[in-house]
Curated annotation (Swiss-Prot):
Name this polypeptide is given: Ribonuclease P protein component
Organism, as annotated: Bifidobacterium longum subsp. infantis (strain ATCC 15697 / DSM 20088 / JCM 1222 / NCTC 11817 / S12)
One GO MF term: tRNA binding
Coiled coil: none
GO CC field: ribonuclease P complex
Entry function: RNaseP catalyzes the removal of the 5'-leader sequence from pre-tRNA to produce the mature 5'-terminus. It can also cleave other RNA substrates such as 4.5S RNA. The protein component plays an auxiliary but essential role in vivo by binding to the 5'-leader sequence and broadening the substrate specificity of the ribozyme.
Length: 119
């Protein structure tokens, strides 16, 4: 899974207002219009992380980001082949257990896949 790097990419995903979430996370997603069909064998998923200072100090924020990266890679097969994802942490993510975050991300990614399949 590649990274969303530019501010423009983050803004594009966040402006679309398509999201799924749980108690501790919000998943914003964008599927490009020209990649709705899965005939193309290449996979192009990009991940961005948004962890604000309301989550905690730098050490806490970095811990949350590290957990998000690991969990996103573990569950990326649930996502459509071509999509941009921004995982946004709520302040409660700092105290959430790894198992809880794992379940929430799996459920949110499955919800994203379901919503994209319906569209």
């Amino acid at each position: 899974m590649e990274r969303l790097q530019s501010h423009r990419d983050f803004v594009t995903v966040l402006k679309r207002r398509r999201k799924a979430g749980g108690k501790d996370i919000v998943v914003h997603y964008l599927v490009p219009d020209d990649h709705h069909d899965d005939d193309d064998r290449t996979v192009h998923r990009r991940l961005g992380l948004a962890v604000s200072k309301s989550v905690g100090h730098a050490v806490t924020r970095n811990t949350v980001k590290r957990r998000f990266r690991v969990l996103a890679r573990a569950h990326e097969d649930l996502l459509p082949a071509h999509c941009d994802i921004v995982l946004r942490a709520k302040p409660s993510a700092a105290t959430a257990s790894f198992v809880s975050l794992d379940q929430q991300i799996a459920k949110a990614f499955a919800t994203v896949a379901h919503k994209v399949a319906e569209a």
